[in-house]
Amino acid sequence: MNNLIIGIAGGSGSGKTTLALRLKERFGEDEVRLISHDSYYKRHDELPFEERCKLNYNHPDAFDNALLIYHLQELKAGRAIDCPVYDYSNHNRSDKVQHIEPAPVLIVEGILPFVEPELCALFDYKIYVDTDADERILRRLVRDVKERGRSLDSVIEQYLTTVKPMHEAFVEPSKRNADIIVPNGGENTAAVEMLAHHIRNLIEKANRL
């Protein structure tokens, strides 16, 4: 199948998901599929909740990239997948899956999709969202408390102990692998329009091959 795999990376709260959604709005309903890298956090049924809370979810080793790579290859070959569903409040994968059909454009967004070389190599176009650190932490606080059922104290502790140091060690350096750096994510309307136009051109080019 002549589809494109677009990667969107950036720090937690940078606006990656918003950018992915804004791009999807520029295309038809069946043209784009969104996949969150977070869905591929490793399963930890063997650990009690208290221990799962202490895990470093901002390190490359936290992700089951082998499964994501396999799923992207399946979609590329025109076959549907059952994507894992991650439960943020329980710090573990749920027993549910999300059925995803192939589409002309596959968008994968997350904090670390550009770190693993084999995964990074699958992306036809790589976008890094660069947002001020103060803005990122404020967005993360609001999101994790309101949308993910987290306590304020747990979000702050996680930010200081793992999110910030892992951003500096892995996320920020990974932007060197990007094809383009976009300030402020989905709030950058001009960038959204430019990217949508460029992706449309890439689709047309792929269909001519």
Task: Name each model feature, range by range.
Residues 94-148:
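ATP-dependent NMP and nucleoside kinases share a basic, alpha-helical "lid"
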Residues 71-108, 113-114, 206:
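Phosphate-binding/switch loop-helix module in NTP-utilizing enzymes
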Residues 33, 42, 46-88:
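Conserved nucleotide-sensing/catalytic segment adjacent to the nucleotide-binding pocket
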